[in-house]
Amino acid sequence: SVYLATDERDEGRWIAGEIDRRRSEGTSYNNMAVFYRTNAQSRMLEDMLLRAGVPYRIVGGTRFFDRAEIRDVMAYLTLVVNPADDIAAKRVVNVPRRGIGKTTIERIDQYGREMNMPFLTAAELAVVDPDIRASTRNAVGEFIQVIKDGATYGGDLRKVVEMIIDKAGLIRALQDEGTDEARGRVENIQ
């Protein structure tokens, strides 16, 4: 079948509808496939399939929400809503690379354990720790500020996501890499 969609959402809805139609005609999910050219196209398609309750698996690629760059964005958003999420904080404290090394991360983690506080709160102590290099303290401070800005941002979710991506420098860092893979990751984030 050929269908001229008005946008990617319309395309995803149509595909999910076609799958549902064929399923109701007796076709097994195992006998259906959807091909797409770029990984960036899978996001909307996966979203529509999930909404329609259609089981799927990705062959030769990674599910959209399992991609590192998407998990990074999700970790930032998690911290905006729940700054006590240590797993999310440790995932993105140095994403993109901002000069916060393993030793500093371990030190922050140790502060948190010793003082029974979340990683992000402990990171605020690192900002004033004279035993940590000034450039690293500044980088930790910038990371904390991104999360605080996100938490106080009074816009709709799309604007919050855009602000976090911009302030964290996620797209800028990938654009600076200049590789085809990095360009694909930028498409995924956008």
Language model features with spans:
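Inter-lobe coupling/hinge region of RecA-like P-loop helicase motors
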Residues: 1-36, 61, 89-90, 123-132, ...
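Conserved RecA-like helicase motor-core motifs
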Residues: 53-63
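Conserved helicase C-terminal RecA-like lobe
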Residues: 28, 39-54, 67-69, 74-190
